């Protein structure tokens, strides 16, 4: 079941759902708008000959922060990691789905490549997989609305929520745009 605006507000008011900083004007009929943080991870395409998800490649990305009051410019065909300004904390019986903003999609901005699902129990910034599929650069302003978080009620609380030792969670408590940790549980079989 998708939560409505009144259900989202109720979950926040009793402290079960955390969105920090929270701005009530960001609540939509069935989602909460989230904003773009000011840090980005860009790929160092001269450090490695290829990306191998089986290997730890610590220098694959570099953290970039635009100058105060300046945007980050995402060029056509470029892919970078960003993150939400908000830290989101989900209880064990709510899952999240991050969706892009329609107005930004119409400009050629993709908010996530594949990872739009947020497990129950997750807490941290949500990493964004930002791509420009337009033929012109797109300016990304820290603090701008970048997506919307939809919340789904589970049929029961997760037995092993994200962050539990049984779940094998790699990104619990992440701050800022977090690079891939695929190598931690990579399996060739």
From Swiss-Prot:
- The residues listed in the UniProt record as binding dCTP, with positions renumbered to this chain, are 101-106, 119, 127-129, 148, 162, 174
Q: Can you say what this protein is called?
A: dCTP deaminase, dUMP-forming
NCBIfam families noted in UniProt: dCTP_deam (TIGR02274)
Biological role: Bifunctional enzyme that catalyzes both the deamination of dCTP to dUTP and the hydrolysis of dUTP to dUMP without releasing the toxic dUTP intermediate.
Gene3D superfamilies reported for this sequence: 2.70.40.10
Query: Which species is this record about?
Result: Rhodococcus erythropolis (strain PR4 / NBRC 100887)
What residue spans carry the region label Disordered?
Answer: 163-189
Pathway assignment reads:
Pyrimidine metabolism; dUMP biosynthesis; dUMP from dCTP: step 1/1
Catalytic activity reported: dCTP + 2 H2O = dUMP + NH4(+) + diphosphate
Q: Which GO terms describe its biological process?
A: dUMP biosynthetic process; dUTP biosynthetic process; nucleobase-containing small molecule interconversion
Tell me which InterPro entries the record gives: dCTP_deaminase, dUTPase-like_sf, dUTPase_trimeric
Q: What is its EC number?
A: 3.5.4.30
- Site note Important for bifunctional activity applies to 116-117
């Amino acid at each position: 079941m998708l939560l409505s605006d009144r259900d989202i507000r109720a979950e926040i008011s009793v402290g079960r759902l955390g969105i920090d900083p929270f701005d009530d004007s960001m609540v939509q009929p069935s989602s909460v708008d989230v904003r773009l943080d000011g840090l980005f991870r860009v790929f160092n395409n001269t450090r490695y000959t290829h990306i191998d998800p089986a290997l730890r490649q610590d220098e694959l990305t570099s953290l970039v922060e635009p100058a105060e009051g300046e945007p980050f410019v995402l060029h056509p065909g470029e892919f970078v990691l960003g993150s939400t300004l908000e830290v989101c904390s989900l209880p064990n019986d709510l899952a999240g789905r991050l969706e892009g903003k329609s107005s930004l999609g119409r400009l050629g901005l993709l908010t996530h490549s594949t990872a739009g699902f947020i497990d129950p129990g997750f807490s941290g910034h949500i990493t964004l997989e930002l791509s420009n599929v337009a033929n012109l650069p797109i300016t990304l302003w820290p603090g701008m609305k970048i997506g919307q978080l939809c919340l789904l009620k589970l049929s029961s609380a997760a037995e092993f929520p994200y962050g539990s030792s049984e779940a094998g969670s790699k990104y619990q408590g992440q701050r800022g745009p977090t690079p891939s940790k695929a190598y931690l549980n990579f399996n060739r079989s």
